Amino acid sequence: MAKKAKGNRVQVILECTEHKESGMPGTSRYITTKNRKNTTERLELKKYNPILKRVTVHKEIK
């Protein structure tokens, strides 16, 4: 029986970069998917941060 190949689409976690510097408690994280073949580097998207109440840059972690 053939082994199932690893999929190119993986789940990644995006975390707010500006929230750490603000010193406020809590964190803003989003879960999304990316295609491993097309996007080899880490994702960096602008998403809404409900704690800071504005759109901030979220970067892929781990």
From Swiss-Prot:
One of its GO terms (cellular component) is ribosome. SUPFAM superfamilies: Zn-binding ribosomal proteins. Keywords: Ribonucleoprotein, Ribosomal protein. Pfam families: Ribosomal_L33. GO terms for molecular function: structural constituent of ribosome. GO terms for biological process: translation. InterPro entries: Ribosomal_bL33 (IPR001705), Ribosomal_bL33_sf (IPR038584), Ribosomal_zn-bd (IPR011332). PANTHER family: 50S RIBOSOMAL PROTEIN L33, CHLOROPLASTIC, LARGE RIBOSOMAL SUBUNIT PROTEIN BL33C. Belongs to the bacterial ribosomal protein bL33 family. HAMAP family: Ribosomal_bL33 (MF_00294). This is Large ribosomal subunit protein bL33.
